[in-house]
Amino acid sequence: MEKKMTFENVTKDELLKTAKVPIRVVETEADIYEDMATVMFEEIVRNNEAGRNTVFIVPVGPIGQYRVLAGKVNAAHTDLSNVYFFNMDEYLDDNNNPIPPEHPLSFYGFMSREWYDLVNMPVENRWYPISGK
């Protein structure tokens, strides 16, 4: 009987051979963030050069890529005027209002501290879900 491949028992070689989407294997967690930031940065640069907007739908996790991306953007003086971030979600309180930005679980607060406050990205290009709308 053939052993069923599961997350717990799949080897790197099996995963790479059977994956239905492109996969890159990196050595460390820091490498993941560097890779994600590099992919995002290159997309921004490529679209800027072509005169196109860049649109990302971004989660709050994983989290390490945002500061790395900010470093790349700032080092290269990259224009973010045509870059749009659609933030995926936000926690609500018991009254269905977004939790305050200073709350440790606030996506808005996290993204402000780890990305928006570090770069020159227009406020109107930052989108968050609004409860009830």
Description of each model-found segment:
Residues 1-56, 74:
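N-terminal glycine-/serine-/threonine-rich phosphate-binding loop
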Residues 35, 39, 68, 110, ...:
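Alpha-helical scaffold segments in soluble metabolic enzymes
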Residues 66-77:
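Histidine-anchored nucleotide/phosphate-binding helix
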Residues 5-20, 31, 79-133:
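Ligand-binding beta-strand-loop-alpha-helix segment within the catalytic cores
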Residues 58-63:
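Glycine-rich beta-strand-to-loop/alpha-helix junction loops that act as flexible
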Residues 32, 64-65:
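Short phosphate-engaging motifs
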